[in-house]
Amino acid sequence: MVAAGDHVGAEAWVDDEQPALPDYSGGCTANIVPALLDPCDERPPWLPEPAWDADAVVLVLLDGLGWEQLDARRHLAPTLTSMAGGPITTVLPTTTATALTSLSTGLTPGEHGVIGYRIHVHGEVLNVLRWTTAAGDARQTIPPQKLQSNLPFLGHRPPVITRAEFARTGFTMAHLDGVRLEGYRVPSTLVTEIGRLTRAAEPFVYGYYDGIDKVCHEYGIADHYDAELVAADRIVADVLAAVPRGTAVVVTSDHGQVETAGNVIPVDAEVQAHVALQSGEGRFRWLHARPGHAALLRAAAEDKHGEHAWVRTRDEIVDGGWFGPTVTPDALSRLGDVALVAKGTLAFSEPNDTGPFSLVGRHGSATSAELYVPLLAARA
């Protein structure tokens, strides 16, 4: 596995005083599937050589595995660190809903419109992973295939192996519509199904594993994280052993992580005086202005939070290419007026954005720890 600077260039490793932005024209999660399923005559330099011209490809996504976290723990992941490749960028926000949709569709967030974890849709805030609003299940009121209608995997219908409980979720319907879903309940079944399908001559198989992300959210980046990385590395080793000789196994992720622990603050009251509602998530918080308050909101947010967040208006983010060179009208309508994009390890709380436990590890922002993810490959 190459060093970071050798793979993407030292200039890509920005100081976190400046936001790290995706490389939408190069090594990015949005470009992996097109490179594998619709390759050009000239292979992109960011695609590891073992993935070139393989008769069969297995793409494994390890949710939550950032390049910086892996690079600091090479001794725990001998299989991953022996593979060819290095870091690429994911998309913004650095969040599962957005990145997995970019991976499956081969489109930027501005094109596919799943532009955050919690997005503004028709006057409501939709939690994309749960596909719920304040009124509950939103699969009827906000049909997933209408909110995101682009076909996954360039219209191919590959087998996709994911957790069985995700099969009928709104998010699965939005970003994996039309694929051949194979559910698993324990990791060994994920490996077994990948082996079965590749031995049946499937040319492309996609497998999703969420253990690292789950552990990091609950326990942070410490002993539990290290143990889960060891387990994930073993899964990849088992996949390489299970597939036919010559199969290319490609491993990537949707985002990295930072440990926020108790470093969570509410949006300042003087800022909230100009806010009608909030969307996004703790490290990429969208503020939707009260009518006529957009300029006042921008000024107040910069004054109160400018030291510990990148404060940007919707236009500044769109014009800056954060979501890609094109942002559709539908995607634009799902954004707030001002974003608080957290620096360092800070997160912004919001009463309507809660879960079953307090998050220790988080993601969503534009730091290098969250933006850079591995793209690795090896032949069985």
Where are these regions (language model features)?
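Feature captures the catalytic ectodomains and active-site-proximal regions of enzymes
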Residues: 1-380
